[in-house]
Amino acid sequence: MSPTQEQLTALGGVFLAAVLVDKIAKTGQVTEAGLTCMLGSLLIRDPKDTLEVYGGDDLALREGYRALIGALERDPSTLQREPLRYALSMLGLERQLAKREDMLEVIGKRLPQIQSQVEHFGPAHENVVAACGALYQDTLSTLRQRIQVHGDMRNLQQPNNASKIRALLLAGIRSARLWRQLGGHRWQLVISRRKLLKELYPLMRNE
């Protein structure tokens, strides 16, 4: 993988989280593979490469890549507007989080507790989802910028769905942080669109 593709893998994580949030909000459904991939990414320490963060391959990230391609191509027929809005909001929240050492410390202390729950129940178990959702609520949801999720109120009002959405936003912001650490910047999404697409298309073909 090229350095740009490493960045795109992390950005694919941001967009996958955004797509899954949109699906839960609109349909109340989410794939266990996608949820497992994103929640698992919160708990990986010292990965040998970016793919290891997402379980060792990027099969689960395909939906995220698709949404990212739609955003970069600017084709109205493939652009997923709500996921794009959520993804950009997560990139913005990551910038605010980076300035809050106190919040980073709380997240750093509570993730190992969640790790022990994962070892006991598995990554997509409702207890793990609830713990990740509560961590988001106690930290990132207190920042000035909020992510407004739009969808069917019947889905949004179900506590389990609300927890999944918050947990996915937490995981998406973790991916945004990884993207920054790998050298990603928002201006690239505007100025380097063609270069990013050129590196992104092969990732979609790696079946």
From Swiss-Prot:
InterPro entries: HflD, HflD-like_sf. This is High frequency lysogenization protein HflD homolog. GO terms for cellular component: cytoplasm; plasma membrane. Gene3D superfamilies: HflD-like. Pfam families: DUF489. Keywords: Cell inner membrane, Cell membrane, Cytoplasm, Membrane. HAMAP family: HflD_protein. It is a peripheral membrane protein. It comes from Pseudomonas fluorescens (strain SBW25). Belongs to the HflD family. The keyword Membrane applies. Its main location: cytoplasm. The keyword Cytoplasm applies. It is found in: Cytoplasm; Cell inner membrane.
